[in-house]
């Protein structure tokens, strides 16, 4: 029998205010790195939350909007 792999993963967002407060969110596996501005109840302010651990993210090729001949 074949095991089914999940398309989503749960990541931990850690407050950049160094309060130790963290949040967990669910994202698709191929999504870019997540940074969010959320409320931190320890410091009682909105602060930036970044991913706690590094994960493999597929590099996206930048879009080329120039009309140059290929």
UniProtKB/Swiss-Prot annotation:
Taxonomic source organism:
Saccharomyces cerevisiae (strain ATCC 204508 / S288c) (Baker's yeast)
Which superkingdom heads the taxonomic lineage of this protein's source? Eukaryota
Report the gene name: MRPL39
Q: What is this protein for, i.e. what is its function?
A: Component of the mitochondrial ribosome (mitoribosome), a dedicated translation machinery responsible for the synthesis of mitochondrial genome-encoded proteins, including at least some of the essential transmembrane subunits of the mitochondrial respiratory chain. The mitoribosomes are attached to the mitochondrial inner membrane and translation products are cotranslationally integrated into the membrane.
Question: What name goes with this protein?
Answer: Large ribosomal subunit protein bL33m
Q: Which PANTHER family match?
A: 39S RIBOSOMAL PROTEIN L33, MITOCHONDRIAL, LARGE RIBOSOMAL SUBUNIT PROTEIN BL33M
Q: Where in the cell is it found?
A: Mitochondrion
Q: What else is known?
A: Present with 2500 molecules/cell in log phase SD medium.
Q: Which residues form a coiled coil?
A: none
Which GO terms of the molecular function aspect are on file? Answer: structural constituent of ribosome
Regarding protein family, the annotation reads:
Belongs to the bacterial ribosomal protein bL33 family.
Q: Which GO terms describe its cellular component?
A: mitochondrial inner membrane; mitochondrial large ribosomal subunit; mitochondrion
Recall the taxonomic lineage recorded for the source organism: Eukaryota, Fungi, Dikarya, Ascomycota, Saccharomycotina
Read off the NCBIfam families from this record.
Answer: rpmG_bact
Which InterPro entries did the record assign?
A: Mitoribosomal_protein_bL33, Ribosomal_bL33, Ribosomal_bL33_sf, Ribosomal_zn-bd
Assembly and interaction partners: Component of the mitochondrial large ribosomal subunit (mt-LSU). Mature yeast 74S mitochondrial ribosomes consist of a small (37S) and a large (54S) subunit. The 37S small subunit contains a 15S ribosomal RNA (15S mt-rRNA) and 34 different proteins. The 54S large subunit contains a 21S rRNA (21S mt-rRNA) and 46 different proteins. bL33m stabilizes the tRNA acceptor stem in the E-site.
BP GO annotations = mitochondrial translation
Query: Sorted alphabetically, which keywords does the UniProt record give?
Result: Mitochondrion, Ribonucleoprotein, Ribosomal protein
